[in-house]
Curated annotation (Swiss-Prot):
It comes from the Bacteria. Belongs to the NanE family. The gene is nanE. Signal peptide: none annotated. Converts N-acetylmannosamine-6-phosphate (ManNAc-6-P) to N-acetylglucosamine-6-phosphate (GlcNAc-6-P). The lineage of its organism: Bacteria, Bacillati, Bacillota, Bacilli, Lactobacillales. It is an enzyme of class 5 (isomerase). Pathway: Amino-sugar metabolism; N-acetylneuraminate degradation; D-fructose 6-phosphate from N-acetylneuraminate: step 3/5. Pfam families: NanE (PF04131). One of its GO terms (cellular component) is cytosol. One of its GO terms (molecular function) is N-acylglucosamine-6-phosphate 2-epimerase activity. This is Putative N-acetylmannosamine-6-phosphate 2-epimerase. GO terms for biological process: carbohydrate metabolic process; N-acetylmannosamine catabolic process; N-acetylneuraminate catabolic process. SUPFAM superfamilies: Ribulose-phoshate binding barrel. Its EC number is 5.1.3.9.
Length: 234
């Protein structure tokens, strides 16, 4: 298992490259109760030249670590109804991820009500206090959320949840305006969410982002096939 990179070292590694999100949830075609599928996705991504992997769950992350030394952005998706945040939504999930020695832990940092009752700045501060050497990424949906997370000391701001909160911009593709605004504010941005084509990724890279995550367009065959099928209907 490689040593955890510093922020500067990781930014060097991610610059100008693609982080591939390798995830499948229960009910999706590539989900398996016994595992074994996401590490194959990660292996394919590495062979293509990916600079990092984003993965969900302790099991998948451990399996991916066994086959690649690429830096991992780790999350744990767990619902806490009636609250909406479900991406590494409490300290319990942070603890589980911190034990894996991964490069980055990503967390929901939207302004929505949380299961733990904390505001996002307080949550970030608690995590940083408990794990001072752990790099952290805020999954946000608006500029203001990104700014709050940045000011609270987060290392990276990801545009992951733009379009997935009712109050954020609803776009069919990536929220380029949000990515650009965060970059102009001097924030280390990891662009993520609805990046469907190499052309979109190139355009986003030219904005000066710290990294780019592509998921569905690479690792969700049902979604990819659906796009081709819908195009023929129009």
């Amino acid at each position: 298992m490689p040593d955890k990179p510093t922020k500067e070292k990781l930014m060097e590694q991610l610059k100008g490259g693609i982080i591939v999100s390798c995830q499948a949830l229960p009910g999706e075609p590539l989900y398996s109760e016994t595992g074994g599928i996401m590490p194959l996705m990660a292996k394919a991504a590495q062979e293509a030249g990916a600079v990092g992997i984003r993965a969900n769950s302790v099991r998948d992350i451990k399996e991916i670590q066994a086959i690649t030394d690429l830096p991992i952005i780790g999350i744990i998706k767990k619902d806490y109804p009636p609250q909406e945040p479900f991406i590494t939504a409490t300290m319990t999930e942070v603890d589980q991820l911190a034990a894996l020695n991964i490069a980055v832990i990503a967390m929901d940092c939207t302004k929505r009500d949380r299961h733990d009752g904390l505001d996002i700045a307080s949550f970030i501060r608690q995590v940083k206090e408990k794990y001072p050497n752990q790099l952290l990424m805020a999954d946000i949906s608006t500029f203001d959320e990104g700014l709050v997370a940045h000011q609270a000391g987060i290392d990276f701001v990801g545009t992951t949840l733009s379009g997935y909160t009712p109050y954020s911009r609803q776009e069919a593709g990536p929220d380029v305006a949000l990515i650009e605004a965060l970059c102009k504010a001097g924030i280390a941005v990891i662009a993520e969410g609805k990046i469907h084509s190499p052309e979109e990724a190139k355009k986003i890279n030219d904005l000066g982002v710290a990294g780019i995550v592509v998921g569905g367009a690479i690792t969700r065959p049902k979604e990819i096939a659906g796009r081709f099928i819908e195009a023929l209907k129009s």
